[in-house]
Amino acid sequence: VSGQGEFHLRTLKWRIGNNEKLMVEFQEPRIPYRETITKAARADYRHKKQSGGAGQFGEVHLIIEPYYEGMPAPESYKFGNQEFKMNVRDTQTIDLDWGGKLVFVNCIVGGAIDARFLPAILKGLMDRMEQGPLTGSYARDVRVCVYDGKMHPVDSNEISFRLAGRNAFSEAFKNAGPKILEPVYDVEVLVPSDK
């Protein structure tokens, strides 16, 4: 069903309801916003939960920045008077279903976090990319460098690192100059020619 405005749509709703005896519902259209960031930011998050037996523990330190195609590998970041040198171990580029990319860079040195927990951290990041920290819209074009963290020999598990990664990402995203991207559509207008 289409119309030239709200009046036309209400008239159609009335006609369908009265003539065809069908119930028609109107819903507000959901605008497909996207979220992204404009500058680099750093965050760390410790997920710690203790309840009787084995608890949960995972700590993630990360830096996020805007991503663009052809961007060089990160070497160092400076925040205030602190400089962070990056030793890139591995890079994963993920093409997002909703457009854009997430680049996940492993810069962990010295076994601060076992490699077996990196997929869990990535899942936590994807949780937040699918439901952005600002409006709940999809986030896009972000590079995340995980450079440090802590684990516990007994209490660390995948869920702990998934939650730590997700919450560290949210915190960093909010400090990275977040912005909302509005959709742009191609529109073709056809009009009859006057002869």
How should these model regions be labeled?
Residues 1-195:
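Accessory interaction regions appended to the cores of large information-processing enzymes
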